[in-house]
Amino acid sequence: MVKPTQAKRYASLGAIALLTTSLVVASPNPALAMHISEGFLPLGWAVGWWLAFLPFLAWGLWSLQQQIKQHSESVLLVALAGAYAFVVSSLKIPSVTGSCSHPIGIALGAILFRPPLMAVLGTLVLLFQSLLIAHGGLTTLGANAFSMAVVGPWLAWLTYCGVSRLRVKPAIALFAASFISNVGTYTLTSLQLALAFPDSVGGLATSFAKFGTLFAVTQIPLAISEGLLTVLVWNWLTTYCVAELQALRLLPQEELP
């Protein structure tokens, strides 16, 4: 039997996930994003990135199955991590290129559930965005997922583990993980575009520098903002979901209040 306090926490988590998702889906504003748009990549590159991504997706599906099988109580936290990534990556500001830039929101889930599982959540986020709010596309889903749902989570996790070894406060490790995952994701996106469209004069290096410079104008401030937001959300989780985090052993006991 679920205790009233547990029921309250579950209801709170479910309400946050439902409310934040509905706010984005119901938004009437047109959505432009720095995900690679539908049909933008040449066919060879689109197929190539799909082939590179599929093994990580298969690994993620297995990881998700194991997570739910071993820790069924974590389903709502998994849903919350997915909803958080969906909402945060749907927040957009104009970029100097005439498109928009946005954070990725993938670091929190990577820290909670490890990078393989985030390949599934990140792909679902990108799929819903491409179908519901015109972010990205289906042909470019492989490239977008490889950068946001594979490279982003692994960078977040490795950064978090590395910074945590310095025995700093968890907030610093969380901020660093979120910041690096953002910058790394869009660095790879810049490389993907540069590989597909090398500069006619300077080649790959010049094209990469151009894309990276344009992305950095808006992405670095957004990476800082997401890092701060991730810390705030983590503080909320360690206040209202202490029992769940302890039961799942998602983080060392001493990092919980």
Curated annotation (Swiss-Prot):
Part of the energy-coupling factor (ECF) transporter complex CbiMNOQ involved in cobalt import. The keyword Transport applies. InterPro entries: CbiM, CbiM/NikMN. Gene3D superfamilies: 1.10.1760.20. GO terms for cellular component: ATP-binding cassette (ABC) transporter complex. This is Cobalt transport protein CbiM. PANTHER family: COBALT TRANSPORT PROTEIN CBIM (PTHR43627:SF1), PTHR43627. The chain crosses the membrane at residues 39-59, 74-94, 117-137, 138-158, 171-191, 214-234. One of its GO terms (biological process) is cobalamin biosynthetic process. Keywords: Cell inner membrane, Cell membrane, Cobalamin biosynthesis, Cobalt, Cobalt transport, Ion transport, Membrane, Signal, Transmembrane, Transmembrane helix, Transport. It is found in: Cell inner membrane. Forms an energy-coupling factor (ECF) transporter complex composed of an ATP-binding protein (A component, CbiO), a transmembrane protein (T component, CbiQ) and 2 possible substrate-capture proteins (S components, CbiM and CbiN) of unknown stoichimetry. Its main location: membrane.
